[in-house]
Structures are given as C-alpha cells and as structure tokens.
C-alpha cells in the first residue's frame, strides 16, 4: 500500500517509463543516502519519462512516512509491512535494508544498484 493505506499496483505506476524501483528502509542508512542522491536526477528527468517508486520495508507506515518526509523524497513511496509480500527475498535482497533496480519502459532491468551518476548517464541516452 501507499502511505495512506491505498492499494497500488507497481506495474501501473511505472508503465511506459524508465523507472528506478528503490527498495529501502528507515533503518538503512546507505539506502537513504542513495535515495537522497537520486532527488536531483528525478527532478531533472521526471517530465521526460522517468520515475522513481520507493518501497519501504517497515513494521509501521508511520516510520516509513516520517523517514521519507525527513529525507524529502518527492516520488511515490509504498510500504511492505512485516515482509508480507516477501519482496526482499523475491528480488534477492535478502535480509538487507534494500537495493535499487533501474528498468526500461518494458520492465527490462538496465542496472542493479546504480549510482545517481550511472542513472543519469543511462537516462541521457534513453530520454533525449
């Protein structure tokens, strides 16, 4: 669900766009630093067919919401409460806080855990 408890289908949110799927957690410092580094890239390319969707691994929605607000994430964030969908295991992220996946308009993975600079280089080529 999103932070308001609404059910959201991830594939509908990223359909036809180059997207960064950001699996993160409030307690994962490296995840949050990585996400914050993506804010300028998101702002530059969001009107050109790029989006980011965060999925927080939390015990409560409030914890994720507070962290996203504190860090200033301008994109849609969803929450997986108590590993209900086993997302981290499905994407081989295991017990860690998170990981990122850059996918193209058809959902093909372009990069796993790319830096902001790598994402920008890829977007420069794809979204001219």
Where are these regions (language model features)?
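Extracytoplasmic and endomembrane cell-envelope/extracellular-matrix remodeling and assembly machinery
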Residues: 1, 5, 60, 119-121
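A short beta-strand-turn-helix
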Residues: 1-19
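Conserved redox-active cysteine motifs that mediate thiol-disulfide chemistry
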Residues: 23-40
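Active-site acidic short loop of glycosyltransferases
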Residues: 15-16, 47, 95
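Thiol-based oxidoreductase modules, predominantly thioredoxin-like and allied folds used
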Residues: 48-63, 73-84
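Hydrophobic beta-strand anchors of alpha/beta hydrolase catalytic cores
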Residues: 20-21, 52, 100
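Hydrophobic, well-ordered secondary-structure elements that form the walls
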Residues: 21, 64, 77, 107
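Thiol/disulfide oxidoreductase modules built on the thioredoxin-like
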Residues: 69-73, 80-127
């Amino acid at each position: 669900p999103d932070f308001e408890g609404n059910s959201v289908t991830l594939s509908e949110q990223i359909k036809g766009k180059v997207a960064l799927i950001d699996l993160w957690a409030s307690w994962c410092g490296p995840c949050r630093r990585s996400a914050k580094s993506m804010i300028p890239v998101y702002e530059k390319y969001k009107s050109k067919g790029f989006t980011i969707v965060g999925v927080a691994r939390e015990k409560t929605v409030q914890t994720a919401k507070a962290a996203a607000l504190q860090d200033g994430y301008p994109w849609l964030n969803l929450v997986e409460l108590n590993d209900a969908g086993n997302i981290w295991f499905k994407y081989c992220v295991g017990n860690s806080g998170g990981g990122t996946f850059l996918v193209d308009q058809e959902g093909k993975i372009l990069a796993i855990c790319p830096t902001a600079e790598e994402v920008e280089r890829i977007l420069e080529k794809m979204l001219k």
